């Protein structure tokens, strides 16, 4: 969710809490749709991985699905950055996007996911990350993951970035407080995401907070806690 849109929504919903209203924010270049007039950069690594799929279809004389897969190879997708070791993929992606921008003479928008919170995926453990809040994970997340991530994007001022922050994380802690691991991770999640928002403020970066969806937080028992959690998160960032 775009920060300005989220602030507008939360201001309208503010009557559910005792918090004072959010102050209006001035317009800037990041308040427009960052995708307008730009090419969605096609992740060359992902495109390369699909060559195996193309070849498999061709081996079956299935030219139709081979052609469909080639279309996907040239379609912009998000690059997931999920570990400190994976930070090097940002430079690789930036270099490839600059090459494509020079080749086409068209402005590229690079789509990234930032996903490495301490105690990640607290309700399922399916994507357990490298940081633990019990072992200074929040500080390590800030200094060894978010800081270099932000520095890399800010240095590439000639490109535009759309960054999704920590998918599923807020929805997880809002709706899974009955799970001790999630309850204990709540403060870490909120502080980590707030820090990432603050560090990724730049004219060439558009941020989207994964605030779940209506089928998840839209139920009566989830809506008010969800709005309050987002309000507190953004106030902490502001």
Q: Where are each of the predicted segments found?
A:
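Substrate-binding cleft of extracellular glycoside hydrolase catalytic domains
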Residues: 99-210, 222-226
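Alpha-helix initiation/capping motif
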Residues: 2, 42-43, 218-219
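N-terminal carbohydrate-binding/catalytic regions of secreted carbohydrate-active enzymes
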Residues: 31-155
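Surface-exposed substrate-engagement region within the catalytic domains
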Residues: 55, 59-67, 199, 203, ...
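Solvent-exposed, charged interface segments at domain starts and junctions
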Residues: 19-30, 75-91, 211, 223-228
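Secreted/periplasmic proteins that engage bacterial cell-wall peptidoglycan
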Residues: 211-213, 217
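Fungal secretory targeting signals
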Residues: 1-27
């Amino acid at each position: 969710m775009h920060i300005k849109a989220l602030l507008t929504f939360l201001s309208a919903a503010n009557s559910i809490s005792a918090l004072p209203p959010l102050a209006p924010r001035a317009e800037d270049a990041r308040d427009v749709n960052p995708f307008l007039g730009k090419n969605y950069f096609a992740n060359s690594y992902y495109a390369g991985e699909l060559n195996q799929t193309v070849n498999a279809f061709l081996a079956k004389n299935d030219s139709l699905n081979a052609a469909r897969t080639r279309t996907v190879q040239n379609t912009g997708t998000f690059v997931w950055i999920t570990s400190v070791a994976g930070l090097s993929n940002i430079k690789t992606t930036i270099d490839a996007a600059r090459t494509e921008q020079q080749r086409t003479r068209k402005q590229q928008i690079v789509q990234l996911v930032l996903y490495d919170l301490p105690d990640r995926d607290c309700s399922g453990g399916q994507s357990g990350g490298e940081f633990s809040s019990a072992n200074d994970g929040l500080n390590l997340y800030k200094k060894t993951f978010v800081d270099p991530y932000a520095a890399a994007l800010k240095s590439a001022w000639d490109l535009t970035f759309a960054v999704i922050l920590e998918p599923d994380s807020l929805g997880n802690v809002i709706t899974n407080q009955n799970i001790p691991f999630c309850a204990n991770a709540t403060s870490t999640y909120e502080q980590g995401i707030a820090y990432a928002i603050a560090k990724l403020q730049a004219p060439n970066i558009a941020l989207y907070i994964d605030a779940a969806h209506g089928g998840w937080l839209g139920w009566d028992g989830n809506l008010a806690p969800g709005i309050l959690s987002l309000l507190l998160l953004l106030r902490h960032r502001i």
